[in-house]
């Protein structure tokens, strides 16, 4: 799994395999945990690669994606709203399209996302292509 971050726009791009997204969905559903990601290669056209995902349960809060000062992707929210996110992330792992993607951005009255959440793109790639991509960068 690779996690790209653009500092000026706060955009996050998560590229992973079916297995990566299945593991991530399990952690999100549990509303706690951490997952390492590769920092091998260039972050271009983004500004940097993030090496860690941290998931935390925050009762009563909508889901928020942010980046900590030490470069971790932080995903927080109420367990019920994290569960909605987990269902969607898991569906990526089961997608028919081997290179599909899903945009998660706030809009007014979003059903699980907080207004100040950073925008995220989840992109599915096969494990071999993911490895090749990280070594080419």
What are these regions (language model features)?
Residues 1-137:
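Positively charged, low-complexity terminal tracts
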């Amino acid at each position: 799994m690779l996690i790209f971050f653009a500092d000026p726009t706060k955009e996050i791009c998560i590229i992973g395999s079916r297995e990566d997204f299945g593991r991530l969905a399990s952690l999100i559903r549990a509303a706690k945990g951490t997952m390492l990601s590769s920092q091998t290669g260039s972050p271009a056209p983004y500004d940097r690669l993030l090496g860690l995902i941290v998931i935390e349960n925050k009762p009563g809060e909508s889901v928020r994606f942010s980046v900590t000062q030490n470069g971790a992707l932080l995903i927080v929210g109420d367990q019920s709203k994290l569960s909605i996110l987990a269902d969607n992330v898991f569906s990526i792992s089961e997608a028919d399209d081997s290179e599909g993607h899903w945009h998660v951005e706030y809009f007014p009255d979003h059903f699980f996302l907080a207004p100040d959440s950073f925008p995220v793109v989840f992109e599915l790639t096969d494990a071999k292509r993911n490895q090749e991509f990280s070594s080419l960068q």
